[in-house]
Amino acid sequence: MFALVDVNSFYTSCETVFRPDLQGKPVVVVSNNDGCIISRSAEAKSLGIKMGEPFFKIKNNTYSSRIHVFSSNYALYADLSERVMQTLNETSPSIEIYSIDEAFVNLSGMMNCMPLSSFGYEMKNQVLKNTGLIVGVGIAQTKTLAKLANHAAKKWRGTGGVVDLSNIDRQRRLMALTSVEDVWGIGRRISKKLNSMGINTALDLAESSLWVIRKHFNVVLERTVRELRGEQCLELEEFSPTKQQIICSRSFGHRITQYSDMHQAICAYAERASEKLRSERQFCRFVSVFLRTSPHADNEIYYGNQASVKLLIPSNDTRDIINAATNALRRVWVDGHRYMKAGVILTDFFSNGVAQLNLFDDNTQRRNSAALMETIDKLNKSGKGKIWFAGQGVEKTWAMKREMLSPSYTTRYSDLPVAK
């Protein structure tokens, strides 16, 4: 038995937690460089604002003065996400973190202790108490059905935010009301083909022939059908699989033409990638840098390139990774272009910093490297300040545009909200 716990309109909810004056008002969050809408409050949805809609389009609408807009505050969202997951860990037997705002919960044996819906409300209330965020809870025998139940919990207010779909009759009634496009893992393209075969609802899909589904689609969709029938095909993954690569990349707030600006950006991306690498307790062997101009720019020749540097000893020391990244940058930089995007990629991971060397290699790891990196990470996470490397520069004119950024309420002492 599974529960899927999902925060309602996560990004906008994170913003309104610290701005109670915005409760009940239309709020949206925009993507990198304040480009497109990536999160909407219920009130914003009711105005017809669509997900992915360019921000400049809603600026000129008659209702624009009533909308509260925020740039993406990833530090705030990550911190609140961690608090939500920690709360679920403390109240549940085991969980699988599925994304930044949702997690599957293992409810095996819970029926012997209390009604499943009661436990769902308990989780919901505890998350609200600890974080101020409202979640929806869907409960069922399989992950796919739990997703369906969660969809219903968030769609119909009468449910109170919790739907227990363990009853087969309730499953069939809900599936009959659910478009096949809304089933987990089925997008617009697959749903169109299913519609052409007369499969329009989740119930139609659940009652389809497994042989027909496997013939016209694949084993993944067959597994979805089995899950809709209550047959568990997907297990709870308590431990995330080890990452095969780490990418840190952003589009720039404006086109970069100077090497010094690009150098600062690459140093900053290398530092962030190194932090992520250490959080995974991994070491990398290859550091790659890519950059490119806009393929859509008028009267400009497109240029894009990538270069990699192999470290002799796998490392997660920011100094080593910055050094390799800047060496790679020198190999791909070409003057005369207006660059719109660049990034750093780390690959070839090791679980420790030891690798086989050639007989005459005398390279060794930096002394006290692990202790220094741990100290820097702790200081940067504490909110007491930010330690950065000189190559990143001070005035980051290349940084992505975030003109409507909210304070770092939970990660910076100077931004702590004052209780009144």
Residue ranges and their predicted role:
Residues 103-109, 306-312, 356-359:
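Short, hydrophobic beta-strand segments
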